Each structure stands twice: as structure tokens, then as C-alpha cells.
């Protein structure tokens, strides 16, 4: 497994010339009623919230973690790709071993309830985006909470134990590289094709020559994914 420093180096070389998102992301923390705390980044849209805004939940990958990993992932990968949405962005640090853990699910849902109560969120446009472990979280959250999320973009991720009837019930854009040696390409493609055959609103984009840790190389595909989901929302 690569160290975090090597991952950051790979990412930096890939995104150094990429445009940045105009909004500011603040590092915050929420203490829950049971005393546990969850760190998160929050970005509010340019121009205020006089009209309802989309909300994007950004889920960072696993591996060696650093404080405020959620904010780092949002700033360097997600925000530049979703800039056209002018969305509210919520980027938590995973409070458990995996995003699909019950504790992580419960804590993130409480965080989203707070954000949605305090800000003008368009409930018809709530997107979850994640990479690797975070992509698994995108599959998990979208299948467990179809009443909340209306779009999902899992990148370089595998599906967990979610039953197939719960997957891709909303616009879902899957991105995976054939050169991924950490999360195999084959099962991801097979799963997406099965869901296509079931008539689910899913799109699968295959990338070439991108190692698993080259997150920055996924940004152009993420931009296309956001555009595709946005078009589905308009239908």
C-alpha cells in the first residue's frame, strides 16, 4: 500500500493545472448528542442561497488518513469538477473504519440533517460522490437512503453487500480504470452492466492507464459525470 505522502504527490502532479472552485471551504466539527464528534468541510455556493441549491456529499478514500482528509479531498478533487452546480458541499472525515459501517452512516446522516436544516437545499438535487473507499460509501449511502440522495458517482470502487435491487435506483455514473491494481476493474464493469440490463439509470465510464492512486486523473471524468447526472435531473 502506498504511503499518504506518495499519494499526495501523484495527485499534485495530476491537478496542478486544473481550475479551482471559487467558493471557500471551511473546516468545521459537529458534536453529536451522544458526545461523539465528526470533522467536516463545508462550502457554501457563490451568490448566497436565495434559491435552493444542490448539495454534494464528498467521501474521501481510505488508506493512510490525515486530519481533515475530507476537506482535502473536496478541495483537490471534487470542487473543481462540480463547480457548474454552484452547490453546497459537505466533506466529512470518515468517523469509522469504512463509510459503510453503521456508525459512519448514522453520524453522516445526522450531519446532513443539520446542514439541510440550516441551508437552502434543493432536495431534488442531492449527490453523493466518492473515490475508492469513498466510492463504496457512495454505493452504500445511495442504496440505504434513496429518499435523500438523487444521484451517485462512485469512482474506483467496489460494491459492498448491498442487494442488487437497491443499487442505482437513481442516476448513477460509475468511473473505473482498467489499470487499477487495487480495486479490480472487471467486477465493477460486470456489476454496472448487470444494472444496465435491469434498466437502471446508470452509466459506466472505463478509463485506461490510470493507476488506482492517480485520483487527479479522474477529475475530467468526474466533470462529465456531473454533467450527465445534471441532465438526468432535468428529465
Regions from the PLM with identified roles:
Residues 55, 59-116:
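Active-site machinery of serine-nucleophile hydrolases
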Residues 15-55, 103-104, 129-131, 136, ...:
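A domain-start/cap signature at the N-terminus of enzymes
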Residues 116-118, 124-169:
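Primarily recognizes the serine-hydrolase "nucleophile elbow" in alpha/beta-hydrolase
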Residues 173-176, 180:
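Short beta-strand/loop motif that positions the catalytic acidic residue
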Residues 85, 167-172, 198-200:
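Short, proline-enriched alpha-helix->beta-strand connector loops that line the catalytic pocket
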Residues 177, 207-214:
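Histidine-bearing beta->alpha loop at or near hydrolase active sites
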Residues 70-72, 184-194:
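Short alpha-helix in the alpha/beta-hydrolase fold that links the catalytic acid
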Amino acid at each position: 500500500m502506498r504511503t499518504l505522502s506518495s499519494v499526495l504527490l501523484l495527485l499534485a502532479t495530476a491537478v496542478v493545472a486544473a481550475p479551482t472552485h471559487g467558493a471557500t471551504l471551511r473546516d468545521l466539527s459537529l458534536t453529536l448528542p451522544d458526545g461523539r464528534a465528526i470533522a467536516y468541510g463545508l462550502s457554501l455556493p457563490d451568490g448566497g442561497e436565495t434559491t435552493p441549491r444542490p448539495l454534494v456529499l464528498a467521501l474521501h478514500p481510505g488508506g493512510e488518513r490525515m486530519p481533515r482528509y475530507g476537506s482535502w479531498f473536496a478541495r483537490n478533487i471534487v470542487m473543481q469538477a462540480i463547480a457548474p452546480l454552484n452547490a453546497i458541499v459537505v466533506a466529512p472525515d470518515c468517523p469509522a473504519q469504512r463509510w459503510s459501517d453503521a456508525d459512519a452512516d448514522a453520524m453522516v446522516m445526522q450531519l446532513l440533517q443539520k446542514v439541510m436544516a440550516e441551508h437552502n437545499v434543493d432536495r431534488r438535487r442531492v449527490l453523493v460522490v466518492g473515490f475508492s473507499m469513498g466510492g463504496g460509501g457512495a454505493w452504500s449511502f445511495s442504496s440505504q437512503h434513496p429518499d435523500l440522495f438523487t444521484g451517485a458517482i462512485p469512482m474506483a470502487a467496489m460494491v459492498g453487500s448491498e442487494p442488487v435491487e437497491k443499487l442505482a435506483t437513481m442516476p448513477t455514473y460509475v468511473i473505473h480504470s482498467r489499470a487499477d491494481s487495487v480495486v479490480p476493474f472487471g467486477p465493477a464493469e460486470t456489476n454496472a452492466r448487470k444494472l444496465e440490463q435491469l434498466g437502471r439509470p446508470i452509466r459506466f465510464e472505463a478509463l485506461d492507464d490510470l493507476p488506482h492512486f492517480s485520483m487527479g486523473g479522474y477529475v475530467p471524468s468526474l466533470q462529465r459525470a456531473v454533467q450527465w447526472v445534471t441532465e438526468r435531473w432535468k428529465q
